[in-house]
Amino acid sequence: MHLSQLIACALLLALLSLRPSEAKPGTPPKVPRTPPGEELADSQAAGGNQKKGDKTPGSGGANLKGDRSRLLRDLRVDTKSRAAWARLLHEHPNARKYKGGNKKGLSKGCFGLKLDRIGSMSGLGC
């Protein structure tokens, strides 16, 4: 079962990688950026000598806040996508609950029918 899921995921990824332009036709290609940690450190260093309440036109305080919120939003999207892939690729943590065969009360009678509770507990079904 796991092998078939793995093969299905691999085929899906192969199909998606072959046609990236058809998946999002209206988006321009992304320009490589600096890693998020460095970008946040640069923005804090640039605005570190200004007060939070300073709203002068040349200060760029609103720009700094917008850059920081955009950066945090990008990080959240990345975390959500990683969680989705983890759920897809790993089996359910309570997989034992969903597997059959070892559930209580599934014993069969002499003719393949389920026995009543007393008969199955005592073994006097047949």
From Swiss-Prot:
Disulfide cysteine pairs (residue numbers): C110-C126
Gene ablation phenotype (knockout): Mice are viable perinatally but less than half survive postnatally due to skeletal abnormalities. They display severe dwarfism which is the consequence of a defect in endochondral ossification.
Main location as per UniProt: secreted
Superkingdom to which the source organism belongs: Eukaryota
Alphabetized InterPro entries for the sequence: C_natriurtcpep (IPR002406), Natr_peptide (IPR000663), Natr_peptide_CS (IPR030480)
Location relative to the cell: Secreted
Region (Disordered) residue spans: 20-73
Name the UniProt record assigns to this protein: C-type natriuretic peptide
Organism: Mus musculus (Mouse)
Classification of source organism: Eukaryota, Metazoa, Chordata, Craniata, Vertebrata
